[in-house]
Amino acid sequence: AMDRPLAKITKLKVVINTAKDDYVNCEEIEFYEMKSGLSEQEKQLLSVFTDLTCSEVRPEATMQQIQALPGYFINIAMQLKNGTYDTWEKKFRIQEYKPYSTPNNWADKLYMKSYTDLDNPTGIYVNSGDELIVMVGETYGNTISLQAIRSSNLSGDKYMLNEGINKLQMKGDGMLFVMYNTELTSENAKPVKIHIPLTSGTVSGYFDLERDKTDAVYTELLQKATYEYFLIKGNEMLLNFHRTKLLQWQPNSIVEYITMFDHFVNWQYELLGLEDIRPALFNNHVNGSSINDDSYMWAGNGQIGFGINALDEFMPTEKLYTERRCWGPAHEIGHLHQGAIAWTGCFESSNNLFSNYVLYKIGRECSNGAPLSVLADRKLNNRPFCNFLGDPKKEDTEIHMRIYWQLWLYFHRCGIKSDFYPELFKKLRNNRNLNNIPVG
């Protein structure tokens, strides 16, 4: 943000000093004029509604005042006043949206891949060409926008929102997400109330563990949903899965399932040493989405992907315990967190420090990786556990993961230094010169 606004600008020069992989691609730049003051229509609405979200009618508002509103708002006012606004629709159309951190900023600071910025689902989807009215309450000076995300995409068409009445024309289809990213320590990082009224988009819903709490609520929401994907919002994870797969494997229960995924993330935090950072400063979610192709599992910035048929490996919930199927998801989550130890040749093994820890936490006595006899044989024959200058594809991931895990067993399990890994990760984050081995 600028210290003072600039007036009468005729030219804008964009200077980019750094870029990932020395590559820059500017797809689009948009400019917006910030609204100042209330319009006459908004002043009229405030004579009937308690605020510009038009989500509650003033007790003193008269029928004469209501009838004087534009027809669209008469219907909203009457449904609110008479208590006939459909409860299910209202649950998603009128919501308070929390502030979230900016994931890209924290990815760099924490030596991690970026988490998602799709932390605020609306449960409402739109089609290309739809006209929307979006009514926004006080934003406390924050930048708020709406984004339409198609299926499992990471980004989509974005629409800036001002306080008050916003009239939008949809350029594409997708599920709507509120984009509200700011510094969490700011005194202005407060929830923002938004109303997307009746006939603006279609409600399909989503499950929020903090709000909805029970399997009974989940079952009802899933049955009513109509969109291709159904989103489950946990405390640490977002699961954006094909609705048909949820109906197949988890038709009546989700609380234990999403709680397990939350555990997978939280357990990995125990190794990373983020207690002073999360969630006070950094509160974005890990996004796990099913992908409509024949891929298996992978991890990248903003998302962990599961091929649609790969879901069969770790659903229903029982598989996460009984068949050690938690390894795949935990391995991919580990890819997000391995940056500080992902040395060349170890990209597919250093993350298994985290997945082995997940196995330990769910009560498995045996870790994955080559047995100690193989490690001892390497030492006997003077062979290193990893050749950092060699071809990563020819390296032995089974040996690599054993080395990382043996350090945990020695320092943590044997009680030699129970904070070894958290302290190591903190030092690697705080002094990048300690970690000068190429990543790959």
Named regions from a protein language model:
Residues 8-10, 22-27, 130, 174, ...:
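Residues that flank catalytic or metal-binding motifs in active/ligand-binding sites
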Residues 1-40:
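Aromatic, loop-rich ligand-recognition surfaces of beta-strand-rich domains
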Residues 24, 434-440:
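Short, intrinsically disordered, charge-balanced linker/junction segments flanking boundaries
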Residues 39-208:
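Beta-strand-enriched, solvent-exposed domains that form extended recognition/catalytic surfaces
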Residues 2-4, 165, 319:
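Signal that preferentially marks extracellular ectodomain short beta-strand elements
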Residues 200-223:
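Long, contiguous juxta-domain segments that are non-catalytic but functionally important
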Residues 218-221, 228-435:
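Catalytic cores of extracellular degradative/oxidative enzymes
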